[in-house]
Each structure stands twice: as structure tokens, then as C-alpha cells.
Amino acid sequence: MEMICEILGKDERLKNVVKVRVPGIYGKKGNPLPKRMAKLVQPAAVALQKVFEDVVKAKGHLYISDMFRSATQQQKAHEDWKSGRKTAFSPPSCNSVHEAARAIDIDAFDTGIGHQRVRQILNKHGWVNIVDTLTGAECWHYEFREKKW
């Protein structure tokens, strides 16, 4: 798959949410992210398109590991975290930015240009990481925020 974020059209079931096509990590790295996850609010999708353009210009690449989660998927992720099946923190349903189609998780360790450079590009386009470290827990999680506070 080409290293782009392609907007495919509206998701009729979710207000202001669009379907996207992005390189994922599942199966063979670079395959499209599964359709059930590949959704963002329109402004976040447009911003992610710009991120991909800048990453490619910098001679890098970006793979997405997670994006939209339904309430059911979010609750399952939370239960997996609580039980220890997964180590990445996941809040209960109705408490995740993934459910609002405003969050992405990236492969922070395979970018071709370093996570610090990718973080700068993401920040430039409104994607904010919730932790300061480039290697610690949740360093892969970015939330789209249209306003800078």
C-alpha cells in the first residue's frame, strides 16, 4: 500500500466520521488498517493526510496500529488490560478518545526517520501525545486536538 491517508467517504452510522485507508501493522506491515478501525472525524482525517505527506517528504513511513473503537471493542480492550492479557492501558467504554474517532496509535519504533521527528510532524498538524517520553508506555498514542490551549 502507498504511504498515504486516503479519505474514502462518510460513515453513515457515525456523525461527522469518515472512513479512511491507511497503512497498518496487521498481516504484512503496510496492509490497510482493518475497516472496522479505519475511521476518524473529518478534521482529524484531513490532518492525518497532511501528516502522511510530511512524513513521506522527510523520507519516512508511518504505520497505524489502532484508530476507531466501538464501545464494545473499547470495553473488551479494557477487560484485556484489567486481566493482564494486554499491558497497554485501556480505559473502560465511554472513556476513550478512540471511541470518539479522534485517536490513533502508531508504530513508534518503525518510522524510518525516528519517533521524535514523527512526533514533531504529528504535533504540527494537531496530533498530541499524552506522555513526554518517546519510548515509555503510551508513547504510540496520539489524540487529535483542533485547538491549542
Residue map of PLM features:
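N-terminal secretory targeting signals
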Residues: 1-9
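Substrate-binding cleft of extracellular glycoside hydrolase catalytic domains
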Residues: 3, 75-88
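Active-site acidic/histidine clusters and adjacent loop/turn architecture
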Residues: 9-66
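Stable alpha-helical elements in mature extracytoplasmic
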Residues: 40, 44-51, 73, 77, ...
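Sec-exported extracytoplasmic/periplasmic mature domains
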Residues: 53-57, 79-83, 123, 127
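Acidic helix-start/capping segments at beta-turn-to-alpha-helix junctions
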Residues: 63-78
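Catalytic cores and adjacent binding grooves of peptidoglycan-active enzymes
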Residues: 84-149
